[in-house]
Amino acid sequence: MDEEEHLHRFGTPLPALQKDVVPAKKPVAIEDQIVKDENGKRRFHGAFTGGFSAGFWNTVGSLEGWTPQTFKSSRGERASSKAQLKPEDFMDQEDLGEFGIAPQGIRTRDEFANEDEQKQRSDQRRRKLMQPELGVGAIPGLPVLEQLLRPVRDKVAVRILKSMGWKPGQGVGPRQTRKEKRQATARNSKEQYLMEHYGAEGLPSNKENKGEEDSNNEDEDDEDITFAPDDYEPIFYTPKENRFGMSYSGLNRDPILSKSSSSSAKPMQHINLFGEMEAQANKKQLSIRGQAFGVGAFEEEDEDIYARDDMTRYDFSLADKKPKQKKQQHVQQRHVIDGFSEDNSPAVLQRPYAIDLPRDFQPRNWLQRRSRFAPMDKERAQKLETASEYKRSGLGRHDLNPDQRAQILGEQQQEEKTAEEQPKRNPFKDHSKSLMERINARTEGFTKGGVITENGEEQQTELAKEVKEANAAIQERAALKTKDLPSAMNSSSAFKPFIADEAKQLRYEKFVSSKLTDDKEITEFLARMQPVTLSLWDREMEKKEFIQAAKIYRPLVGLMNDRFVSEANVQAEKVEQQEKPPEERKIVMERTKTMWKPTALLCKRYNIAEPFGGAMLEPEKELKAKAKISVFDYLETSVNTKANFETPSIFPKHIEKSIPEKVETPPSPPPAPQPEAEIQDKPNTKEEPSKHTFVPKTPLEQAVDESRNKPISEKVDLFKSIFEDSDEEETELSEQDKLAILQESFGLPVTSTTSAAAQNVLRNTSPPRGIFASLFSPKIKDAAKEPAPTKFGPIEGSKLKIAYKPRKERLRNDRELAMAEVAPEDIYGPKLPTAPPQKPAAPEIQAEANIDDRLQQLWQQHAPKKRKAEKWVEKKCISGSEDSDASSSNESSSSDSSDDNDKRSKLSKPKKSHKGSSSKKSKKSKLKSKKKSKKSEESKHKAKKKKKKSKH
């Protein structure tokens, strides 16, 4: 039992043989065995056996015998050379098979197949190979066949190496010094030791290199002398892809002369020339190799002592090989003659078209020459007679051209003018003449004849002398009236764009009359006329204006003159254009020197501060040249473009007139500004008429323009006005109203929120200095008429915003603020002074600073309280609690607003106090709480509906 437990069985066991039963299958004797082909048919027959089957299956050709597959006509290929037939064309597949008389094998003729080791290897390696090895072969040395079958020329790689300076016996690689060569030899010796002890084949040892080591030690310092590397066989570590032991290759199934077998075979191994060849990638010409004569079917072959054992000779299974039988056609094809089969390839037949010959067609032998003295055919004579009939009737003149007719009539031909001699015809050359002269010139071209009546043509009688004199007088009067009229050709009288500058207008007229087109010629022409005082920029601008004005204000005559060209001059212009060589454009190289500045995006990527605090301009913007603007650049463009087009809208006209006010001495406080309604009602006799009238924008347009470029943080008031309830605006005072109360108490003009640009305008109170002082200083003539401007003039409320800050903060510029935000570690250079030297302030600035401090204190006292943060209330809360919270919040807000109203009544005397505001506010707060409760109930109802729908 123990032995059976430890016994391992693999596979399915054969059925056990019974003792009494004899096995049914008996071994077949040799004389009873039958040789069969791949189809399972009997291959060899007797002289009178086999019958139809033997002749059908064993004939040369296809499986069906000599049945033709396709028919190809050789009628059109008679002239072509006939293909030379080969013995393989008359052989069957069995003859070309493995056991046939001419088995096919593939052999390549490649320059890379055999290596010329005798030339490439050194003398050491050759001597090593010549030494006999045990178990290799009976003949020592290099194989004789390998020496006989050497390639005629070297390989491509060897030829390339020789062209690069390589010589046989040297290694491949860069040249080495003595020290490097010694290290390489030591490394190669280690690799050879490993190959000898752990590899399959021992490599030749370089014993001669040991003698060189002593000489190398002498001149170690001489690094200028280099040597070629030693020629050694590199080690290629092939991956192990089998399960054999180390250095065991096993039975190789590859043919002898294949790549895989040649790489693994030893150099002294015998080469079998009768094995199958391997097809290389380049597919060289095939050749048939093999035994010339076969052996009988029932005879054993002689053992080939030179052959190598192959695994294809062994069976790996006990089962018999069942040959694959091909399906045979047993069904007779329809409409096919016996012995033939239907063609499977589609035949493309050209459809022949019948030629319709005429009834009277008579064939003619065109090779037979006719005599010119032979009589003409009747048909041909009849055709010639009909063709010349119209000439005999006098109609042949229509076949003549004008030259032939002039030659027959004997006329003298007028010499045609060449295209160069003919002047360019101007269809508007008579425009400079008067109207009557042109009418007379037209009437003179007509031939005068008599009046045709019933009796015949009556000749025209000459006019009387008095009538002629009267007509001449009328023509003179008409010529006098039309004398001063501007003609179309005289462009100077029609249009004078530079009439303000007579010299410039004169230059323009000369430029128009010159009719120059080349830019270089125009520049030279104007340079001769322009004064010396003109700068280069003015000269270029004047040239550009002249060209543009000549294009725009070109008379109609010139435009039409270019369109109508005489036919004789077209060819001449084409010839001139072809002969004219292309102009060479001069390339002007400009060099600019700019300071490099990294972009803001690059500074963000590297997490560093921008240089100069980001105040330096971009180099692309600096390099952009300023456009040279001229009036004539925009004359052809449209007035309205997509960018500036606005839809027309009608608004009521409202013109606000600024009223100058007299200001008292500086120590006295400025008077409070009157309301706008009172200012408009009071008539002002000293008012000057307003020079510019404009239609102001509507409040909606102003709000949109102001909020267009603002950030979202500054649009809070706009969002509040849209989304908040109107009750809050009525209950609570806005910040603008509180600001207005403070401004009225101090006598300042009522202002509202504006942009930072308007705020900077108020801050910049210093007078203009330097070269710009004359530009911004008030004129002397108008100074007497206009009163002195007030320090706080009336400014429109929608354009200003006052932020109450200390003067120190307002006097800082943008650069100081940017530099203050930068950490001190990021700043490169000496440390900046902490506190700049203070100068004694002027009395006016000191007074203004005191006013600012006073305003700051009042603003802190009367500043609006911060709005409480709103809490998020869930929809499931009880509506009663919401009502109570809303009422309490409204009561608190109403109490706050009532306190603000009391303060407001104390500060502003002209304003009237509001009575009963608290009662109204309480009613509104109750209504508001009811609305909120209704909204919460509706939202709950909608949420329930959504849940039901999601469940369904």
Swiss-Prot record:
One of its GO terms (biological process) is mRNA splicing, via spliceosome. GO terms for cellular component: catalytic step 2 spliceosome; nucleus; precatalytic spliceosome. Residues 886-896 have a biased composition (Low complexity). Residues 107-123, 375-402, 414-432, 679-691 have a biased composition (Basic and acidic residues). Residues 104-127, 165-233, 320-345, 370-432, 660-711, 822-952 are annotated as: Disordered. One of its GO terms (molecular function) is RNA binding. Residues 323-333, 906-934, 941-952 have a biased composition (Basic residues). It holds the Pfam family G-patch. Residues 153-199 form the G-patch domain. Disulfide bonds: none annotated. It comes from the Eukaryota. InterPro entries: DUF1604, G_patch_dom. Residues 214-233 have a biased composition (Acidic residues). Belongs to the GPATCH1 family. This is G patch domain-containing protein 1 homolog. It comes from Drosophila melanogaster (Fruit fly).
